[in-house]
A protein has these predicted regions:
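Intrinsically disordered, low-complexity regulatory segments
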Residues: 1-3, 28-29, 35, 86-94
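A broad, structure-centric signal for solvent-exposed, well-ordered loop/edge residues
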Residues: 8-10, 15, 29, 40, ...
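Acidic, low-complexity intrinsically disordered segments
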Residues: 44-94
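A short, structured beta-strand/loop element
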Residues: 19-42
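Short, exposed beta-strand "edge-strand" segments with a Pro/Gly-rich flavor and a Y/T-containing core
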Residues: 5-7, 25-33, 76-84
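Short, charged/polar N-terminal "headpieces" of proteins
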Residues: 1-27
């Protein structure tokens, strides 16, 4: 099962996250990804705040896939946001 694509909410400068939504059987799931995670995924550190939505668009497929996987792996609830950080993409093997 996969979450469905929702909408981009925008960049929150104070929290340094890009907020977006996903849908689980029509129910809106709030999601966010840290700017550090996007920078790590893209291998860049020079992205300005006004470029964050464009950066998200370039990385959207991998971000949404990981948000969906995290939602179901952690049996997340619709009333809690799914927040992605660098360690959600780059885990060290055990």
């Amino acid at each position: 099962m996969q979450l469905q694509r929702g909408e981009i909410q925008g960049y929150d400068f104070n929290r340094m996250v890009l907020e977006f939504t996903m849908l689980n059987q029509g129910k809106v799931i709030l999601c966010a990804i840290s700017t550090a995670a996007m920078d790590d995924l893209e291998g860049r550190r020079d992205v300005r705040p006004d470029q964050r939505v464009d950066q998200f668009m370039r990385l959207r497929e991998v971000i949404e896939e990981r948000a969906s996987r995290k939602f179901f792996e952690e049996q997340a609830r619709a009333d809690r946001p799914v927040v992605l950080r660098s360690n959600d993409f780059f885990r060290t093997p055990r």
